[in-house]
Amino acid sequence: MQVLDIGSGVGGPARTLAAEFGCRVTGIDITVEYCRAAETLTDKVGLSTQVQFQCGNALDMPFGDEAFDVVWSQNTMMNMEDKARLFTEVHRVLRPGGVFAFEVVLAGQVADPHYPAFWASSPSLSFLVSSEEMRAMLASSGLRERMWEDTTQRSIVNQRNRKQALAGGATPVLGLGVIVPTELEAKTVNGLRNNEEGRTCTVEAVYTR
């Protein structure tokens, strides 16, 4: 099985998918430093033959048509302004019957989010859309909805636990601070506030081609 991880970062989800399911995973990320770190970490855990990384733009992916069985994206689409173009690309690289699974932060019913947030330090880097807008763009791309789950309440529980851990001085060596080296506490607090106040919501969804 061939899996594509869009916005693969330092490669944690890609390595997990490969290790747990035995699939071959290709990660794509626009940040060169993330791709280099992902390659180094993947080599250290012995998964380089299963997991590879490509530095590139998800809106214009360097892959052939119908190249993947699964496309995966975990909390990266908030930084992509042209989501319609992204979904067109996802449809293109997926094989018929292929699966697009993602987790994303969406705009809530209340005014703009508090910043800094985990996905953006300021509004200029944030491109949130509502659930309705996201679903409409996905449908227009030709992808078919199979599951759409609002996970906001679960996110709130996790965020409260993270906030409490930070308040207690818990700073694990391999924690979020590795990839979020600045404003970690402020981003944690704002993430919780945004969900509690209805400024954002979190969703997990599965679509098929």
Label the model's feature ranges.
Residues 70-82:
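A short SAM/SAH-binding and catalytic strip from SAM-dependent methyltransferases
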Residues 25, 100-101:
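A short hydrophobic/small-residue beta-strand
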Residues 59-70:
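A short acidic, Gly/Pro-enriched loop at the edge of an enzyme's catalytic core
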Residues 4, 10-60:
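Class I SAM-dependent methyltransferase SAM/SAH-binding core
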Residues 105-125:
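Short, glycine-/aromatic-enriched active-site segment of Class I SAM-dependent methyltransferases
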